[in-house]
Each structure stands twice: as C-alpha cells, then as structure tokens.
Amino acid sequence: MRKKDLPDYVPTYIEDQAKEQRLDQELEIAQAVQKTFLPSRVEKLTGIDIAGICEPAQETGGDYYDMISLGKNRMAIAIGDVSGKGIQAAFYMTFVKGVLHSLSALILSPLELLNQLNRLFKENATRGTFVSMIYGILEADKRELTFARAGHNPMLVVRANGDAEWLMTKGIGVGVANSLLFMKGTEEYTLKLNEGDVAVLYTDGITEMFFFFF
C-alpha cells in the first residue's frame, strides 16, 4: 500500500467498524426488548397444561407469544411474527403487545380483536410492514379454543390417539388489508380439545430450521 493511499483507507475501515458495532448494539437492544416483553410466567388453568418458549436466532426478529389471563378459567393466547428484523421489528412487537393487553378483556371475539389490531396497525406502522398472528381464547371448563388465524403458520393439533391435523383456517395478515377485506378474508374457528390432545403454535423459525437441516 502506498503511503498516500493510507488516509483514504483508514476512514473507510473505521466507518465499517463503527457500522458493525452499531448493528451489534441494535441486535442487543432488540434481543433485550424481546425478552422483556415475552411472558415471564404462565397463569394456570384447571385441567390444561400451557407452555411457551422463544429461542432467538443470531438475528432477532419480531417473534412474539403471549398468555393473558381473562379470569373464570379462561386465557387469551397469542403468537405472532412481525415482518422485518432488529429494532424495528421489536418496536412493532411492543405495539402489538400493548394493543392485545388493552383489548383482550374488552373484546371476546378473536376475529373482532384482530380486526381492531389490524386497523390500528395500518394506521401506525410503516407501509409494507405486517404481522402474521394467531389469537384465541382458551376456555378450560369447556376445553375449547376459539381463535382466528391472520396469515400465520397453521396450528398443528395432535390428538390423544396419535392422529394429527393442520388447521388451515383462512386469514389475512395484520396490516395487509383494510378492515372490510380483513373481515371477509379471515375466519373464526372453535377447536374442541379432549384429554390428552395437544395444540402446537409456532412461528416460521421452526419451518426455516426444518428446511435448513432436512
């Protein structure tokens, strides 16, 4: 390297290093936000076992799940994935969580709640940003889960006898369409659960990992 080239080389190197450090800091912030807003404990329901886990990849996205106690042996259950990565996805995840916690006790129809979330998200989110989500209300006394699927991965139900089924209910992602189209394109469904049945909700991290290894 010629000496006269050094001044041009050093600033570029420093700029690249600063950019890398900034991205690392953003990743740490996004991971901290994600951990903070995931449930730290799960309220117990009589006769129902509930568990959740989130293991972030190297690049934190907008994966989100929640369990919100509604009293009377009922619980609101949500799982979603905000498009994008990093701080922006984490920010919109906090927005979604805030809306769900504000409305879950007031709106007992999962479809209508998602419709309101869709309206608020479209009004506040950057154009092109969306959320895939399953939101439902689990009534332990009835062993019923009434839910709506807004463009999210289909729920997997494994029955006690070993039979399995994918619940491919129709639905449009939150933030994709206006309220009229969202309501027309999304349906509410009630799943009847028997003793020993298992319902599995997940984000696309599971499917991406499956394709990566297999």
Positions of PLM-derived features:
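CheY-like receiver
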Residues: 1-11
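… and, occasionally, acidic/histidine-rich disordered N-termini of signaling adaptors
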Residues: 12-200
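Hydrophobic alpha-helical signal peptides and transmembrane signal-/tail-anchor segments
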Residues: 212-213
